[in-house]
């Protein structure tokens, strides 16, 4: 598989080139990017950089190469506009020296209007830009994705309360397809590292970037691993490594598949989400007219909205049942391959990234996730 790098690195490459141009340094067609807590430097190609607005601002441009042909950010055009502002504060906190501004095509939180950017992305930007920032100045950095608003329509961003464009929520330097063997290999390596350094009785498996971002924003102290679509094999690997508890944390659109016994969750391999929901609705004796409506829903999110508009208590009952079924099916899956006492807990959030449901095992932990 072709190697690629996550969106934060390409944004940082363009930004670093713009700041250097603004401070009088010559343009280079690549930038060496530092990664927090990593000695290696990553070479990021930059398309161009130049002075604009009477030479008071600089524009840096790069094109993201995630290495993933189907990734929405592959070949994404990135603009970063840098502007230096004199500061007279002697003891400025370094966090105050860079102001990141969401420009056109960059996702913002629907409730707060703040830029949707991960902790990792901020750390990469600050790590690389603070060292080239002239003394006595602060940096205003506007990030623009010219095609971001259009491309965001192909994502589930809006379902998570992210509007106006694409979020910058990469959480590692390298990229892996969630369905590729490299993703499985990387997750197994993370699990091995966690177990070999410190013995943890409980770990958290998250499915996608939104789940990872949400989990890392909480006060949970357990190790967190992004498992992509390889949930089944990684549950077995965790049991083999004598982990006591695994908390499955994710969006209902993914975790619902586990309730149907589907443990490789990529959509091109298996979907059946509506069918699984209808099956659970029958088991819970949901009125037949509602079951008919659920079966005609175009997606799980529409089905949930339909349920909640009709009966919020019934919706909660069904989704808690789903969470409980995820836990039970996970235990049954493990027993096919290994004799183990490992507990599997399920905690599920909705499209607004609100943590809402859990199975019986997850009830012991859901309050900790909500407490942030």
Curated annotation (Swiss-Prot):
Its EC number is 2.1.1.195. GO terms for biological process: anaerobic cobalamin biosynthetic process; methylation. Pathway: Cofactor biosynthesis; adenosylcobalamin biosynthesis; cob(II)yrinate a,c-diamide from sirohydrochlorin (anaerobic route): step 6/10. The keyword Transferase applies. Signal peptide: none annotated. GO terms for molecular function: cobalt-precorrin-5B C1-methyltransferase activity. It catalyses: Co-precorrin-5B + S-adenosyl-L-methionine = Co-precorrin-6A + S-adenosyl-L-homocysteine. Keywords: Cobalamin biosynthesis, Methyltransferase, S-adenosyl-L-methionine, Transferase. Gene3D superfamilies: CbiD-like (3.30.2110.10). The keyword Iron does not apply. NCBIfam families: cbiD. Belongs to the CbiD family. This is Cobalt-precorrin-5B C(1)-methyltransferase. It comes from Prochlorococcus marinus (strain MIT 9515).
């Amino acid at each position: 598989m072709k190697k690629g790098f996550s969106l934060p690195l390409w944004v940082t490459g363009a930004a670093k080139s713009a700041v250097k141009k603004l401070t009088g340094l010559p343009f280079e067609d690549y930038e060496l990017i530092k990664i927090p807590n990593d000695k290696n430097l990553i070479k990021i190609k930059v398309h161009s950089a130049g002075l604009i607005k009477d030479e008071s601002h600089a524009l840096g441009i790069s094109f993201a190469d995630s290495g993933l042909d189907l990734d929405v950010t592959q070949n994404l055009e990135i603009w970063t506009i840098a502007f230096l502002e004199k500061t007279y504060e002697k003891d400025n906190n370094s966090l105050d020296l860079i102001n990141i501004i969401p420009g056109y095509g960059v996702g913002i939180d629907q409730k707060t209007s703040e830029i949707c950017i991960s902790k990792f992305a901020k750390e990469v930007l600050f790590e690389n830009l603070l060292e080239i920032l002239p003394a006595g100045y602060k940096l205003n950095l506007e990030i623009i994705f010219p095609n971001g608003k259009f491309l965001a329509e192909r994502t589930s961003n809006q379902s998570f309360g992210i509007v106006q464009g694409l979020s910058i929520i990469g959480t590692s330097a390298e990229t892996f397809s969630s369905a590729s063997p490299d993703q499985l290999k990387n997750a197994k390596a993370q699990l091995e590292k966690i177990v070999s350094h410190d013995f943890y009785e409980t770990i958290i498996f998250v499915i996608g970037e939104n789940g990872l971002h949400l989990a890392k924003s909480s006060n949970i102290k357990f190790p967190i691993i992004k498992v992509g679509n390889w949930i089944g094999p990684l549950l077995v690997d965790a049991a083999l490594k004598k982990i006591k508890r695994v908390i499955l944390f994710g969006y209902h659109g993914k975790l619902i598949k586990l309730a149907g016994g589907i443990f490789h969750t990529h959509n091109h391999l298996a979907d059946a989400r509506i069918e699984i929901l209808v099956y659970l609705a029958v088991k819970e004796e949901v009125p037949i007219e509602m079951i008919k409506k659920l079966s005609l829903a175009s997606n799980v999110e529409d089905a949930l909205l339909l349920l909640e508009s009709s009966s919020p208590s019934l919706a909660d009952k069904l989704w808690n049942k789903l969470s409980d079924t995820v836990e039970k099916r996970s235990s049954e899956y493990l027993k096919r391959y290994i004799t183990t006492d490992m507990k599997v807990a399920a905690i599920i959030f909705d499209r607004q990234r609100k943590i809402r449901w859990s199975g019986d095992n997850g009830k012991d932990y859901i309050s900790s996730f909500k407490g942030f």
